[in-house]
A protein has these predicted regions:
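Conserved Class I SAM-dependent methyltransferase catalytic core
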Residues: 150-205
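Beta-strand-rich binding-surface signature
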Residues: 40, 56-59, 79, 131-135, ...
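A short acidic (Asp/Glu
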Residues: 68-74, 93-96, 148-150, 187-193, ...
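Short "lid" loop at the C-terminus of a central beta-strand within the Rossmann-like core
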Residues: 88-90, 144, 183-186
Length: 262
């Protein structure tokens, strides 16, 4: 029922121009402008609440271009070793110079310089440089679903699964991660996330204030990677936490559409 309601509202948004939707969204949800980009603010808000970016010696930024998550983490840990992986054939994804020119930041792109986490050679390079070594892994990747918002969960499934596998390869025991996720209505999505969180002592689903209220973006924050994973069934708890954010999203989508109708 929640999925149908959300899909209907997302379909209703397609009746309005992208420019109108952006203006209405900014009017409703954006606070006064700040000098920091939205991605920086999101990780700042996550870190203020959960303290995952402090005292980091080594971290990996997965699918992180243009690099605000990495920038924020390095600002707190100026002497850390930082690694980043991002697509190089998409101008929206490449790391900006202020990130990739830092002496303590190493970009991992693979032999073909693609930075594609689905490429086995890129995965191999990541595992060699970061395997079992990171205090923190940040995974903020997503697939562009413009015009296909109702397929966002399906279109992002493979990427999120790939990121979870890389997180488990790269985190040391006791390490933490921040993983962007979207909807989790499908059985395979919930099962994938259930299997993943069993590798951690604690986990929580969270939407930082700077994440736009009407979209499906949330973050799965996991603490203290275990040497041996649990065998717990977290499906009900995962569904409960997702449902909380579905209801908030419904409320904000209705606000957005009502404003657009004026």
């Amino acid at each position: 029922m929640l999925q149908q309601k959300l899909n209907k509202l997302k379909d209703n948004l397609n009746a309005f121009s992208n420019k109108s939707a952006v203006c209405a969204r900014s009017k409703l949800f954006d606070k006064r402008p700040t000098r920091r980009p939205r991605c920086w603010r999101k990780l700042l808000e996550i870190d203020k609440k959960f303290h995952v970016c402090r005292h980091v010696d080594t971290f990996l930024d997965l699918c992180g271009g243009p690099g605000e998550f990495a920038n924020y983490t390095m600002s707190l840990n100026p002497l850390c070793k930082a690694y980043g992986v991002t697509l190089t054939n998409n101008s929206a994804c490449v790391y900006k110079p202020t990130v990739c020119k830092r002496k303590n930041f190493t970009t991992i792109t693979g032999p073909d310089k693609s930075g594609d986490v689905f490429d086995k050679n890129v995965v191999f390079e990541i595992s060699i440089k970061c395997g079992n070594a990171c205090d923190l892994v940040l995974a903020d990747g997503s697939v562009d679903v413009n015009g296909r918002e109702n397929e966002q969960e399906r279109l992002n499934f493979d990427l999120i699964m790939c990121e979870t596998q890389l997180i488990l390869i790269c985190l040391r025991p006791g390490g933490n991660c921040v993983l962007k996720v979207f909807d989790a209505f499908e059985h395979k999505t919930i099962q994938m996330l259930n299997k993943f969180v069993n590798h951690f002592e604690k986990w929580v689903l969270y939407k930082p204030p700077s994440s736009r209220p009407a979209n499906s973006e949330r973050y799965l924050i996991c603490f203290n990677k275990l040497v041996r994973p649990y065998c717990n069934d977290y499906v009900n708890e995962l569904e409960k936490q997702f449902k909380k954010y579905y209801r908030i999203q419904l409320k904000n989508l209705n606000k957005l559409i009502n404003l657009l109708k004026i």
